[in-house]
């Protein structure tokens, strides 16, 4: 599968590693992202849970990022979340 050239550049730079994509892993990350979204929606009606809502949405978004990376056959190394999200 063709992937964005940026991913290949990040592999060469050592920030990402090339992997064999697994559809089951992609689906599992999407399911986890949905769980985070469900929890965030549960917290939406309670202002005292704003931090939990924010963190749940952030973690859910990152699960989607990881699903996309898995789909394209790459995984972040020690580059951190920021680079993966960009």
For the regions a language model picked out, list residue spans one by one.
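Terminal alpha-helical segments
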Residues: 1-86
């Amino acid at each position: 599968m063709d992937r964005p050239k940026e991913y290949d550049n990040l592999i060469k730079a050592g920030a990402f590693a090339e992997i064999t994509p697994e559809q089951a892993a992609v689906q599992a990350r999407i399911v986890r992202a949905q769980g985070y979204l469900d929890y965030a929606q549960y917290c939406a009606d309670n202002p005292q849970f704003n931090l939990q809502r924010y963190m749940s949405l952030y973690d859910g978004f990152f699960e989607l990022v990881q699903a996309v990376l898995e789909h394209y056959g790459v995984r972040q190394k020690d580059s951190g979340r920021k680079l993966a999200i960009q």
